[in-house]
Design a protein with these regions (language model features):
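Acidic/histidine-enriched, beta-strand-rich ligand/metal-binding domains
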Residues: 1-75
Length: 75
């Protein structure tokens, strides 16, 4: 399991976990909501990791590439 903590104060996202064995991405929001997305390619987690390191918008990437595009489950 790979975990990224988002420390940017303007981000609504607190943490992103990626399980490469299951290809599952879990997104945890600062307001307590959490969702798991299925069949996520490793390239998406790599890009999210890069965005976190560069302090760029993870939320924008998730909105454009993950949310409403992959099967999900509310946690």
């Amino acid at each position: 399991m790979n975990t990224l903590t988002i420390s940017h104060e303007l981000s609504k996202i607190h943490q992103v976990d990626y399980d490469s064995a299951l290809s599952e991405l879990s997104v945890f929001f600062k307001d307590g909501r959490a969702y798991k997305y299925f069949k996520i390619e490793p390239r998406h987690f790599s890009m999210i990791s890069k965005l976190v390191q560069e302090r760029k918008s993870v939320g924008k990437y998730l909105t454009e590439h993950i949310f409403n595009k992959y099967d999900q489950e509310k946690l």
